Curated annotation (Swiss-Prot):
Its cofactor is Mn(2+). Mn(2+) 2 binds at residues 107, 139, 189, 264. Disruption phenotype: Severe embryonic lethality associated with a high incidence of male progeny. RNAi-mediated knockdown causes 20 percent embryonic lethality and 18 percent larval lethality. Abnormal meiosis and mitosis leading to defects in gametogenesis and embryogenesis. In spermatocytes, defects in the organization of astral microtubules. In oocyte meiosis I, defects in autosomal chromosome pairing resulting from abnormal synapsis. In embryos, RNAi-mediated knockdown causes abnormal mitosis due to defects in astral microtubules organization. This is Serine/threonine-protein phosphatase 4 catalytic subunit 1. It comes from Caenorhabditis elegans. Residues 1-28 are annotated as: Disordered. Its EC number is 3.1.3.16. Mn(2+) 1 binds at residues 79, 81, 107. Serine/threonine-protein phosphatase 4 (PP4) occurs in different assemblies of the catalytic and one or more regulatory subunits. The regulatory subunits are likely to be ppfr-1, ppfr-2, ppfr-4 and smk-1. Interacts with mei-1. GO terms for molecular function: metal ion binding; protein serine/threonine phosphatase activity. GO terms for cellular component: centrosome; cytoplasm; nucleus. GO terms for biological process: cell division; chiasma assembly; dephosphorylation; double-strand break repair via homologous recombination; embryo development ending in birth or egg hatching; meiotic cell cycle; regulation of meiotic DNA double-strand break formation involved in reciprocal meiotic recombination. InterPro entries: Calcineurin-like_PHP_ApaH (IPR004843), Metallo-depent_PP-like (IPR029052), PPA2-like (IPR047129), Ser/Thr-sp_prot-phosphatase (IPR006186).
Length: 333
């Protein structure tokens, strides 16, 4: 969604140290803590360590269903898009892992300058604290999309080959498609599908594949709410659908949920309610693409599903590696 940026930072290969861990079954807590410590400094880990970490992440994600069942309390986060230093701001205001349980709604990569470090950090946290860090798939967790919008090129630039990109995109295929919190809050990256009436229909999708160009899996990752829309409309994105209050109400009633929480669209205020608070958009990339001027938000749900929004701004310029000059926006999605 919205404006994209040309990534001109760090155009030469970054220095990557020697691997510190072996096969995934030998990946120790100590190894993961070392990876997390390094990635929290926005430093790359060795290519072999990426391979091992991704293998471990796949093992964990493979045990999770298409619809993750999550208990409150939990903090819900929207798109990050490789804005590593803003992810650090998110953890400052939301609390560190494992003190806070997190659910990220996808779109970890593309457009920002640090998609590699961002995604690998989230994976390392997932591997270290699998019940505290929940990740679901966004439309940018896709081989095709990442070859266009920055992640593929970033992997080539930082590692000198496409191996890291291949390891990461294999993980994409294992990410869950949705989540449900306490049986009452349905979470998804994009939105609803005319092909899906019940969560059980999501549970039987074969998710371990590249995101299709159409169909229910595509719709979950690409659809958007549209005020005044009746039924289902064609999406200007070229994938997914526009859905209105009627479709949202029907889905909630059929599945016994009170709220549909999603990301996928830039919201200048960080979050936005739709359809009499049946649908909520959460956006967690402040000053999107280092030029949009928006704030970001996260949503904390307590043990009783009471909602508390936290608004935060982009990391100060002196704390980040992005150039001060606003990059040229050359495309929309």
């Amino acid at each position: 969604m919205a404006l994209a940026c040309t990534d001109s930072a760090n155009s030469t290969f970054s220095r990557v140290d020697s691997p510190t861990s072996g096969p995934s079954d030998q990946l120790t807590t100590h190894d993961l803590d070392r990876h997390i410590e390094k990635l929290m400094r926005c430093e790359l880990i060795a290519e072999q360590d990426v391979k091992t970490l991704c293998a471990k992440a796949r093992e964990i994600l493979a045990e999770e269903g298409n619809v993750q069942v999550i208990d409150s309390p939990v903090t819900i986060c929207g798109d990050i898009h490789g804005q590593f230093y803003d992810l650090m701001e998110l953890f400052k205001v939301g609390g560190p892992v494992p003190n806070t349980n997190y659910l990220f709604l996808g779109d970890f990569v593309d457009r920002g300058f640090y998609s590699v470090e961002t995604f690998l950090l989230l994976l390392a946290l997932k591997a270290r604290y699998p019940d505290r860090m929940m990740l679901i798939r966004g439309n940018h967790e896709s081989r095709q999309i990442t070859q266009v919008y920055g992640f593929y090129d970033e992997c080539l630039r930082k590692y000198g080959n496409a191996s890291v990109w291949k390891h990461c995109t294999e993980v994409f295929d294992y990410l869950s498609l949705a989540a449900v919190i306490d049986g009452k809050v349905f979470c998804v990256h994009g939105g609803l599908s005319p092909s899906i009436s019940t969560m059980d229909q999501i549970r039987v999708i074969d998710r371990k594949q590249e995101v299709p160009h159409d169909g229910p899996m595509c719709d979950l990752l690409w659809s958007d709410p549209e005020e005044g829309n009746v039924g289902w409309g064609l999406s200007p994105r070229g994938a997914g659908y526009l859905f209105g209050a009627d479709a949202s109400k029907t889905f909630c009633e059929t599945n016994g949920v009170d709220l549909i929480c999603r990301a996928h669209q830039l919201v200048m205020e960080g979050y936005k309610w739709h359809f009499n608070e049946k649908v909520l958009t959460v956006w967690s990339a402040p000053n999107y693409c280092y030029r949009c001027g928006n704030v970001a938000a996260i949503l904390e749900l307590d043990e009783n599903l009471n909602k508390e929004f936290t608004i935060f701004e982009a990391a100060p310029q002196e704390n980040r590696g992005a150039p001060a000059k606003k990059p040229h926006a050359d495309y929309f999605l």
